[in-house]
Amino acid sequence: FFLALYFIGLGTSNIRDGWFFEAEVGKKVLRRRLRRGMPLVLAAIIPRVTLQKINDALELGEGETASEIYDRSKENAEPNLEMFIHVTKDGFGAIGHVDICYKGRIISFGNYDTNSERLFGMMGDGVLFSADREKYIEFCKRENHKTLLGYGLALSPEQLAAVDKEIAKLMSLTVPWDPPKTVKPKRPGIDKEEPMYAYKLKQEADGRLYKFTSSKFKTYFVMSTNCVLLADTIVGAAGTDILSVRGFISPGTYQGYLDKEFERPHSLVVTKRVYQ
């Protein structure tokens, strides 16, 4: 019964897109609409499934590199903002991570202060960081063996102004944070000191880190105030669809949305790239 209701809702959403498609050709409006996505359990595996498809294609010799297999671009595409979906083959990284790149700098959010972690890392101080794009991509591939799926968006001047305003608003709620070199051992004198990921990010990717003094992002929680919500808060200022009314958006949900938007001829998403 509930599955039937879901597919009815999904069909209604797609029909709605068709009705309004012609009216939106060539337009990049700032109005946000509710978009119904696939069930969360299915959406969660999208990044990992995509990675597997790329790796399988490489093994079958369908291309010499992952880029030859995956990369696509619309005609005359000139993206001015990127969204990255991170994915690893194993572990929690298979669920994915989301950040954006704007004006040559990565903007990301997460529980990067390991010393503040609670609930097995599901909660902690919310940390926003900015990093050099090229250095960050190489850092992610080297440090975590990640594959990054990049989606280029072509925004209008009005949309870029809205994004600038939202970033400035978020930054006004933060103060700089200087991460320690190592994580505090849980059992001093027994446990070995481990390097702090945030410190390495600062040193190797020109990272600039910040903590929130107020706002919902002051505390990171994997099921609500997570990396996807921060990215959606910024990009949503440009008028992208609302993907959840419940507050939780998984990286896979966002990737599914970006993939679908890329297939639309006149959408904001104009390129797809893989970095492996």
Model-derived features with residue positions:
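Non-catalytic ligand/cofactor/substrate-binding and regulatory segments of enzyme domains
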Residues: 1, 9-222, 258-276
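Active-site nucleophilic cysteine motif
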Residues: 94-95, 217-251
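Polar, surface-exposed loop/tail segments
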Residues: 245-264
